[in-house]
Design a protein with these regions (language model features):
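Alpha-helical transmembrane segments in multi-pass integral membrane proteins
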Residues: 2-5, 19-41, 45-61, 80-84, ...
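Generic structural signal for small/hydrophobic residues in well-ordered secondary structure
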Residues: 10, 18, 68, 75, ...
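Hydrophobic alpha-helical membrane-insertion segments
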Residues: 12-26, 99-117, 302
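Small-polar-interrupted transmembrane alpha-helices in polytopic inner-membrane proteins
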Residues: 14-16, 179-198, 242-248, 335, ...
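Membrane-interface helix-loop-helix regions
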Residues: 33-65, 98-160, 177, 191-193, ...
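Juxtamembrane transmembrane-helix termini
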Residues: 62-96, 104-122, 309, 314, ...
Length: 379
């Protein structure tokens, strides 16, 4: 059974996030201030980028939509990753798949802060402090309410929490129905906790910080249902039934933060769910595509690097008289090149090493379908 559709959706998700950041967030004075660009720098936004931050009622917010697709892909492939290995082996492989690449890319992002400060003669951002870095390295910064150094690793922190939660539930029962019953029970408690956190606690309370990511994690469980249906562990009718319950829990949890059912996050994640569902139904029609497959292969380092590298390069290029369109195209080209290098010389070797380490720690895994292997990357 093919899973190529999910792998190629990584490319669509990554491009959606890049467009959102380059055509939208880049023009935010607050973001430019964080990286060290002076307030006097105020680039003009071209007409084709105007809709990105002002999509209108019900409009598509590229970045939110793209992250939603990433979360569904993760929910879909994590059960595949656990299919033939122990929970311990899974967690070891997840560590090596995520953290070394993340740390390497974080160093590149950190260097961009120094380059920006040197070029513009501005003070270094507080995000370059040792304290900030130490809290960001383990991807636990969201628990303390700290923003991401690279603007994007907050979603990676969500995924790490999901991996741990899913692995613990998986230990309790591998049967699909038992897994989902336990998951729904857990998500229901989280939904109630999120409501209490938003209505009876301060935004900075520990309960609020601990439950802030549950709207994302609940949504990720929807991706698991596609796996169970694909591998015939659930009938389509059963998957739809469980999906309806989890989707309602997602809407209710998101509403605790957005103030109403169907806010921008819930709406755009629903768009992501519609796209993923359509691609799942049409999965047999997906074929090799050099562009999509390449972007999907490097999507993890591309996602981690595009914001800080792009923001700094675009500002410098525009300051030298380069038009915005050429500036973002050149910056994207540089980011693609660097991401490819990280993928080839860091991500692939480290993943291979992680598999060797996990095999030494436990029983060697049974063979997994070849077409499922590329999907193990993150985000």
């Amino acid at each position: 059974m093919k899973v190529k559709f999910a792998h190629q959706l990584r490319a669509i998700a990554a491009l959606s996030v890049v467009i959102y950041h380059y055509w939208g967030i880049f023009f935010s004075p607050a973001v430019r201030t964080i990286i060290g660009v002076p307030a006097s720098f105020a680039p003009a936004k071209p007409g084709y980028a105007q809709h990105v931050m002002s999509p209108g009622q019900g409009g598509l917010i590229y970045g939110v939509f793209g992250v939603g697709v990433f979360f569904l892909i993760s929910g879909f492939v994590i059960p595949i990753s656990l299919r033939n290995i122990s929970t311990g082996t899974f967690l070891v492989r997840r560590f090596f798949r995520i953290y070394p690449v993340y740390w390497f890319c974080l160093l590149i992002s950190l260097s961009m802060y120094f380059i920006c400060s040197w070029y513009w003669h501005t003070p270094l951002s507080d995000r370059t402090s040792l304290k900030y870095l130490l809290q960001t390295l383990p991807l636990l910064h969201s628990v303390t309410g700290m923003a991401s150094l690279d603007f994007v690793c907050w979603s990676l922190a969500v995924e790490v929490k999901f991996y741990v939660i899913f692995a613990l539930i998986f230990l309790a029962g591998r049967n699909a129905h038992k897994m989902l019953a336990l998951s729904i029970g857990f998500l229901t408690l989280c939904c109630a906790a999120a409501y209490l956190a938003q209505h009876d606690s301060s935004p900075e309370s520990m309960l609020s910080l601990l439950t802030s990511d549950m709207k994302f994690i609940t949504f990720m469980f929807l991706g698991c249902l596609f796996y169970y249906a694909l591998y015939d562990e659930l009938t389509v009718a059963a998957a739809l039934g469980y999906g309806a319950i989890i989707y309602v829990l997602f809407l209710m949890t998101a509403a605790s933060y957005e103030g109403s059912i169907g806010g921008p996050l819930a709406r755009n994640y629903t768009y992501a769910l519609v796209l993923f569902s359509a691609c799942y139904v049409l999965r047999d029609r997906f074929r090799d595509n050099r562009v999509l497959d390449f972007l999907a292969d490097i999507s993890f380092p591309l996602y981690l690097l595009h914001s800080t590298v792009g923001y700094v390069l675009m500002a410098i290029l525009i300051d030298h008289g380069v038009a915005f369109t050429f500036a973002w195209v050149i910056s994207l080209g540089v980011v693609l090149l660097v991401a490819f290098g990280v993928h080839k010389y860091v991500e692939i070797p480290v993943n291979a090493f992680g598999k060797k380490v996990s095999n030494l720690a436990g029983r060697p895994p049974k063979p997994v379908q070849r077409d499922a292997l590329p999907l193990e990357g993150s985000p």
